């Protein structure tokens, strides 16, 4: 039951953060996928969360030619999250969230360049594509790191509450 609630909460947070007005690339999406990689031991659940939330939000904001690269970038974020635990240190979460944002940046901008419509299909064109993507990267990195720290901290606190409530219930029942 807990996995269903966590999945549903993450799905709603991811979709809504993408649909409400926001700064370019400043959404919960990356943090949700990093967290999903850490939280769900069954990797198919993380993948289902990613695909469903992206497809639903893309249905509303529009499908586009860069979708394969964007989805691949988000898949990389799940892969980075696999190396984290819900109780990972803040420093580790910060470092891995930054690495995930960087992976997304490199993959998604490579996809934009491969499309061949905005930049020359040369090394210089690739570098130009990455340079032009830097303003988007900073916003995403700040969002991914900040939202990841928040999600992991929230999960730590909520998971700490569950055993405490279970122990309190056992104590009350044993007093009778």
Model-derived regions, located:
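Central hydrophobic cores of alpha-helical transmembrane segments
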Residues: 10, 46-56, 93-101, 168-170
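Interfacial aromatic-anchored transmembrane helix boundaries in multi-pass membrane proteins
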Residues: 16-27, 51-84
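Membrane-helix interface segments
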Residues: 2-6, 42-48, 67, 87-91
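Structural signal for the C-terminal ends of transmembrane alpha-helices
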Residues: 16, 36-42, 79-88, 153-162
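Hydrophobic transmembrane alpha-helices
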Residues: 1-38, 45
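Membrane-embedded alpha-helical hairpins and interfacial helices in multi-pass inner-membrane proteins
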Residues: 90-165, 173
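Short helix-perturbing small/polar motifs within transmembrane alpha-helices
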Residues: 50, 69-109
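Alpha-helical transmembrane segments of multi-pass membrane proteins
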Residues: 10, 30-34, 70-78, 145-148
């Amino acid at each position: 039951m807990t996995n269903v609630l966590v999945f549903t909460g993450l799905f709603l947070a991811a979709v809504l953060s993408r649909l409400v007005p926001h700064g370019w690339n400043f959404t919960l999406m990356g943090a949700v996928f990093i967290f999903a990689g850490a939280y769900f031991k069954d990797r198919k659940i993380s993948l289902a969360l990613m695909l469903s939330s992206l497809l639903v939000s893309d249905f509303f904001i529009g499908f586009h030619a860069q979708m394969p690269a964007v989805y691949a970038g988000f898949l990389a974020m799940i892969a980075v999250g696999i190396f984290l635990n819900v109780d990972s240190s803040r420093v580790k979460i910060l470092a891995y969230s930054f690495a995930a944002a960087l992976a997304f940046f490199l993959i998604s901008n490579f996809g934009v360049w491969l499309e061949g419509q905005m930049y020359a299909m040369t090394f210089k064109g690739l570098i130009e594509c990455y340079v032009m993507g830097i303003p988007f990267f900073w916003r995403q990195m700040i969002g991914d790191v900040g939202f990841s720290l928040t999600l992991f901290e929230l999960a730590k606190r909520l998971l700490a509450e569950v055993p405490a409530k279970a122990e309190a219930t056992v104590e009350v029942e044993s007093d009778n």
